[in-house]
């Protein structure tokens, strides 16, 4: 019973906090330079982790980077 509870809490923590944070940093680094296949993978990640990305949504920032002249 205790092992199941620990496993469930670990999976829940991974789904709600760890993987969305990794997804967020990946999207932030690759959003403007991704190929079409990579962009499809990004959309899949956002779809798959959508409920947990809502927890991180106040911190998401996808504003365009300033241009370098």
From Swiss-Prot:
User: Where does the record say this protein resides?
Assistant: Cellular thylakoid membrane
Catalytic activity from the UniProt record? a plastoquinone + NADH + (n+1) H(+)(in) = a plastoquinol + NAD(+) + n H(+)(out); a plastoquinone + NADPH + (n+1) H(+)(in) = a plastoquinol + NADP(+) + n H(+)(out)
Where is it mostly found?
membrane
The answer to whether keyword Phosphoprotein applies is no
Q: Which GO terms describe its molecular function?
A: oxidoreductase activity, acting on NAD(P)H, quinone or similar compound as acceptor; quinone binding
Task: Tell me what topology the record assigns in the membrane.
Answer: Multi-pass membrane protein
Sorted alphabetically, the keyword list is: Membrane, NAD, NADP, Plastoquinone, Quinone, Thylakoid, Translocase, Transmembrane, Transmembrane helix, Transport
Regarding protein family, the annotation reads: Belongs to the complex I NdhL subunit family.
Assembly and partners are described as: NDH-1 can be composed of about 15 different subunits; different subcomplexes with different compositions have been identified which probably have different functions.
- Tell me the function of this protein: NDH-1 shuttles electrons from an unknown electron donor, via FMN and iron-sulfur (Fe-S) centers, to quinones in the respiratory and/or the photosynthetic chain. The immediate electron acceptor for the enzyme in this species is believed to be plastoquinone. Couples the redox reaction to proton translocation, and thus conserves the redox energy in a proton gradient. Cyanobacterial NDH-1 also plays a role in inorganic carbon-concentration.
Name the chain's protein: NAD(P)H-quinone oxidoreductase subunit L
Q: What is the lineage of its organism?
A: Bacteria, Bacillati, Cyanobacteriota, Cyanophyceae, Acaryochloridales
């Amino acid at each position: 019973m205790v092992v199941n509870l620990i496993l469930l809490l670990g999976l829940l923590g991974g789904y709600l906090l760890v993987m969305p944070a990794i997804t967020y940093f990946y999207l932030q680094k690759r959003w403007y330079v991704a190929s079409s296949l990579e962009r499809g993978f990004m959309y899949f990640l956002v779809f798959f982790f959508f409920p947990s990305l809502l927890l991180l949504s106040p911190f998401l920032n996808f504003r365009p980077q300033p241009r370098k002249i």
